[in-house]
UniProtKB/Swiss-Prot annotation:
Domain Radical SAM core per the UniProt entry, residue ranges: 141-376
Source organism (scientific name): Paracidovorax citrulli (strain AAC00-1) (Acidovorax citrulli)
PROSITE patterns membership: MTTASE_N, MTTASE_RADICAL, RADICAL_SAM, TRAM
Alphabetical keyword list: 4Fe-4S, Cytoplasm, Iron, Iron-sulfur, Metal-binding, S-adenosyl-L-methionine, Transferase, tRNA processing
Protein's UniProt name: tRNA-2-methylthio-N(6)-dimethylallyladenosine synthase
Length: 449
């Protein structure tokens, strides 16, 4: 009987990708199969995130909840960014943990588990061995028509509030050919949509075929678009400073590049942006969006916002709200500033009451939610191209898929539509989703009847 591994993932899409790779590595090396039931697992892994406040305490709290499972011989591992930050401290506080590993050493999981058995003591490896992990990962196993592909690791921007360079290392790009081989392999398995991942994906500079030449992100997009079977290309996360004219022009050259962009701005006040060490002004950010929308007028924008950064005044907050009004964001991920240990911003004087920060966050989210509602309602009556992902979470008898602009659409349809591209007429706008009716279906798949 195959051993079972349960993986709990916290945080970003990079972590989702890494969690899938953990399962692939363990399956190839030791025959582990994934399970969604922690009670039947032989191995439990937490893939952690340290971006938000109290992330470490959350991990130790969750570890405490599964400690009782050690009685039947379950192995426990902690990976991800909290593992990188805490290292041996995790073993000191939770000595029942068997292995601790960082984002760059997940490929060593089978080896670490074997050493845990042989040496009868916990193993810790949170080193940064460049891009080595990608050389040791088995071919991806995918289910469905959409997949993530990591093209680079780390970040070299060192924004004053951000812990990523310290937990994932500086920017290292995967070789150009390696990325294309992975995407082509996914296309052979029926994947139609790929999301290219990196902490700063548009800073990509991949070596080409063992030569001294390097490919930038715009060139990588062109080659990915040429791979047979790939119909949609997404990417996240990008940095405004690396949004070059070549990358902007790619939106004119590459129809497969979706009209949806997540481009974190973080704030709308130049004073706060400077304190954050973001390296651009609000006007420069808006200029990039204007250029993009000159090419793609229907480009949907989402972003990240930090409210209550140390020293933020009502005037600063007002400038952020004006930027939101100017851009008309389609969605956002917005948070109250939380100091991360070891970052420059953690030592900044912060005298803004929490109640004020909370009020500002609520105001910001109210405006974004109004934008979401308005944009969703404007889609009613239009025909949207949908990639069908599977059963609807609202109603298992229906299907769900995503528009090019990343809106979830629920609709009645035959299960054979899963994995296909279909045209759907939008009939109703819900709070965060749309409803629709199938118009056509590719490849002879059947609409509901």
């Amino acid at each position: 009987m195959a051993k079972k591994v349960f993986v709990k993932t916290f945080g970003c899409q990079m972590n989702e990708y890494d969690s899938d790779k953990m399962v692939d590595v363990l399956n190839a090396a030791q025959g582990y199969e994934p399970t969604q039931d922690v009670e039947e697992a032989d191995l439990i892994l937490f893939n952690t995130c340290s971006v938000r406040e109290k992330a470490q305490e959350k991990v130790f709290s969750d570890l405490g909840r599964i400690k009782h499972l050690k009685a039947r011989g379950v192995k426990i591992g902690v990976g991800g960014c909290v593992a990188s930050q805490e290292g041996d401290e995790i073993i000191k506080r939770a000595p029942y943990v068997d292995v601790v590993f960082g984002p760059q050493t997940l490929h060593r999981l089978p080896e670490l588990l074997a050493q845990r058995e042989a040496l009868a003591r916990p193993q810790v490896d949170i080193s940064f061995p460049e891009i080595e992990k990608f050389d040791h990962l088995p071919p991806a196993r995918v289910e469905g028509a959409s997949a993530f592909v990591s093209i680079m690791e780390g970040c070299s921007k060192y924004c004053s509030y951000c812990v990523v360079p310290y937990t994932r290392g500086e920017e290292v790009s995967r070789p150009f050919d390696d990325v294309l081989v992975e995407v082509a392999g996914l296309a052979d398995q029926g994947v139609k949509e790929v999301t290219l991942l990196g902490q700063n994906v548009n800073a990509y500079l991949g070596k080409m075929g063992g030569t001294a030449e390097v490919a930038d992100f715009a060139l990588l997009l062109e080659y990915v678009a040429d791979i047979t079977g790939i119909e949609r290309i997404r990417f996240t996360t990008s940095h405004p400073n690396e949004f070059t004219q070549r990358l902007i022009d790619a939106y004119a050259r590459i129809p497969k590049l979706v009209s949806h962009l997540h481009l974190p701005v973080q704030h709308g006040s130049d004073r706060i942006l400077m304190a954050m060490k973001r390296g651009y002004t609000a006007m420069e950010y808006k200029s990039t969006i204007r250029k993009l929308r000159a090419i793609r007028p229907d480009l949907a924008m989402s972003s990240d916002f930090i409210v209550g950064f140390p020293g933020e005044t009502e005037d600063d907050f007002g400038k952020m709200m004006k930027l939101i009004d100017d851009i008309h964001f389609d969605n956002s991920f917005s948070f109250i500033f939380s100091p991360r240990p070891g970052t420059p911003a953690a030592s900044l004087h912060d005298d803004t009451p929490h109640e004020v920060k909370l009020r500002r966050l609520q105001e910001l989210q109210a405006v974004i939610n109004a934008n979401i509602k308005s944009i969703s309602e404007s889609r009613v009556g239009t025909v949207q191209r949908i990639l069908v992902e599977g059963a609807s979470k609202r109603d298992g008898s229906e299907l769900m898929g995503r528009t090019e602009c990343n809106r979830v659409v629920n609709f009645a349809g035959h299960p054979r539509l899963v994995g296909q591209m279909v045209d759907v007429t939008i009939t109703e706008a819900k709070a965060y989703t749309l409803r629709g009716e199938v118009v056509t279906a590719d490849h002879g798949a059947l609409a509901a009847h």
